[in-house]
Curated annotation (Swiss-Prot):
It comes from the Bacteria. Keywords: Carbohydrate metabolism, Cytoplasm, Isomerase, Rhamnose metabolism. The keyword Transmembrane does not apply. The active site is at H22 (proton donor). GO terms for cellular component: cytoplasm. This is L-rhamnose mutarotase. The keyword Metal-binding does not apply. GO terms for molecular function: L-rhamnose mutarotase activity. Substrate binds at Y18, Y41, W76, W77. InterPro entries: Dimeric_a/b-barrel, L-rhamnose_mutarotase, Rham/fucose_mutarotase. One of its GO terms (biological process) is rhamnose catabolic process. Residues 85-104 are annotated as: Disordered. It catalyses: alpha-L-rhamnose = beta-L-rhamnose. The lineage of its organism: Bacteria, Pseudomonadati, Pseudomonadota, Gammaproteobacteria, Enterobacterales.
Length: 104
């Protein structure tokens, strides 16, 4: 299992809306994530800095990357575009984090 962590941001006035849209996420999105080998997916909000920290365990990098090509993911990105900075393809602006420490 590969561990991935990343940081995104959310607009300062959109914290509550971001959380509302994730609780619960669309069932079809949860299904796509699981079917593509995503496990233990969490997102944490740092309200003071408007940062989102994501963590997910994936079965393979290729399967994780394939999620972006699904219709439901494309629709989700559009749905979230008004609450967070996005790339021209509507994907959230995201930076991978380097692992520093792990205790099993």
């Amino acid at each position: 299992m590969l561990r991935k962590a990343f940081v995104m941001s959310v607009f300062p006035d959109s914290h509550d809306e971001y959380q509302r849209r994730h609780n619960p996420i669309w069932p079809e999105l949860a299904e796509v994530l699981k079917n593509h080998g995503a496990h233990h997916y969490s997102i944490f909000l740092d309200k003071q800095r408007n940062l989102l920290f994501g963590y997910v365990e994936v079965e393979s990098e290729a399967r994780w990357e394939a999620i972006a090509q699904t219709d439901v993911c494309q629709r989700w990105w559009k749905h979230m575009g008004d609450v967070m900075p996005s790339n021209p393809d509507n994907s959230p602006i995201s930076d991978a984090l380097d692992p520093v420490f792990y205790l099993d």
